[in-house]
Amino acid sequence: MRREERNMDKLLISFLLSLFMVYFPPSDVVLPSQFEASTDSYVPMSSYPQETQSAKTPSPGSMHPAELIKEYSPLAQSVRQLSVKPLDEPLINRLEKALAVPVKYQSNYLRI
């Protein structure tokens, strides 16, 4: 019974605290209704260069293939760099020769 009272007290305190924070926010919080476009503290929504650039990028359907390749070449380059490439056959053979453990030294070696 005492445990339920503690849980109820915690719930009530957290609810009252959240209501207090909604109606009396800290002084450094500025609500959108308090903004004026003429003040120095106004920051436009797309203030980052990536956002403005992506907003200006035309849709892929309206571009020619050459322009499309030019626009997305950094993306294609990063995909090419990060993709896993298959190893050449001679390199695989060299790795097998260098890293292979002879059969007689393996733990599962069986004598016939």
Swiss-Prot record:
Modulates the activity of the potassium/proton antiporter KhtU. Involved in protection of the cell from methylglyoxal, a toxic by-product of glycolysis. Residues 42-64 are annotated as: Disordered. Keywords: Cell membrane, Membrane. The keyword Cell membrane applies. One of its GO terms (cellular component) is plasma membrane. Residues 47-60 have a biased composition (Polar residues). Induction: Part of the khtSTU operon. Induced by salt stress at alkaline pH. It comes from Bacillus subtilis (strain 168). It is found in: Cell membrane. This is K(+)/H(+) antiporter modulator KhtS. It is a peripheral membrane protein.
